[in-house]
């Protein structure tokens, strides 16, 4: 079913997006993956990987949405709920370098080398396609509380595993630093919200006291306190807005956009190395997979 959904999306791209735009994207893609020729053994799978990249990793100029996210937004009113839901599932895909940890008859357990998270993937006849410790480029898509492969892969030779894991770890460490920063900002935001609530309660108490007092002197003192609390409220609100902006920037610009870009860049670089190896088997693979 997922393969059919992707084929529908590929067909939609072919019918509704100008061919010049797709050709420009292909040239951009091939800057890091190498030019694809029809006589390459992996031509079909690499073309599918390009279309996945175009739909799922390429951002529309001037937006913070991928091509697929824009397509969904533009057509949400004309598609059936089921179709819309299946496309939204695809937009939530996880692209990674995966390592096979366990192979069962109809599922595999994989480790995402970028996040160190494990996933159980539903996959028919998995023992025919995967072996334990395989490392490969792929995407998984969530659907009905399960995960599925998109079906397009780039498997890397066993001798390259040490190099690939070293490259993936660089991103893992960067992402971990972003998560630590996010946790710190979220704690700060929580602290600010508590201050805001405490300030609001204090303001209401002072207002009640002012209403109940008959003493002019006491009322003046309470009014002064109220003004101070209102000034504090303005400062707290400003801090809350600033922290919210920092959290939003970190989540969108760093963790989503820059994170996806760095993952895509590394995966495409490795795919190009794999293509060189495919074309030149007489060269030792360790002379290809290197910085």
Language model features: what each stretch is:
Residues 1-56, 242, 246, 251-258, ...:
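C-terminal helical accessory/scaffold domains
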Residues 17-101:
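Accessory interdomain/linker segments of ATP-dependent helicases and helicase-like nucleic-acid enzymes
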Residues 106-110:
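Short aromatic-glycine-enriched beta-strand elements
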Residues 117-122:
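A short macromolecule-binding patch
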Residues 123-139:
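Short nucleic-acid-contacting surface segments enriched for D/E, G, S/T with interspersed K/R
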Residues 139-146, 153-155:
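Short, charged beta-turn/beta-strand-edge "cap" motif at the junction between a beta-strand
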Residues 149-165:
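Short, compositionally biased
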Residues 149-150, 167-291:
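C-terminal effector modules of nucleic-acid-centric enzymes and ribosome-associated factors
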């Amino acid at each position: 079913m997922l393969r059919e959904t992707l084929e529908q999306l590929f067909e939609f791209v072919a019918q509704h997006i100008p061919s010049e735009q797709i050709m420009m994207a292909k040239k951009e893609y091939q800057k890091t993956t190498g030019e694809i020729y029809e006589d390459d053994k992996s031509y079909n799978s690499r073309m599918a990987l390009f279309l996945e990249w175009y739909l799922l990793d390429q951002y529309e100029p001037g937006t913070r949405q991928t091509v697929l996210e824009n397509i969904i937004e533009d057509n949400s009113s004309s598609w059936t709920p089921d179709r819309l839901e299946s496309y939204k599932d695809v937009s939530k895909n996880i692209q990674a370098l995966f390592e096979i940890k366990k192979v069962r008859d109809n599922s595999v357990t994989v480790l995402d080398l970028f996040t160190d998270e494990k996933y159980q993937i539903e996959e028919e006849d998995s023992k025919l396609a995967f072996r334990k410790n395989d490392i490969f480029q792929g995407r998984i898509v969530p659907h009905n509380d399960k995960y599925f492969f998109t079906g397009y892969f780039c498997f890397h030779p066993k001798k390259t595993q040490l190099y690939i894991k070293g490259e993936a770890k660089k991103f893992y460490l960067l992402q971990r630093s972003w998560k630590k920063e996010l946790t710190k900002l979220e704690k700060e935001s929580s602290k600010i919200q508590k201050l805001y609530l405490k300030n609001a309660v204090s303001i209401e108490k002072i207002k009640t006291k002012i209403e109940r007092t008959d003493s002019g002197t006491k009322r003046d003192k309470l009014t002064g306190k109220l003004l101070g609390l209102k000034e504090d409220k303005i400062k707290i609100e400003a801090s809350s807005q600033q922290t919210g902006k920092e959290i939003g920037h970190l989540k969108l610009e760093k963790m989503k956009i820059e994170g996806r870009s760095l993952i895509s860049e590394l995966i495409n670089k490795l795919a190009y190395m794999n293509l060189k190896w495919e074309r030149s088997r007489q060269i030792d693979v360790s002379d290809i997979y290197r910085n």
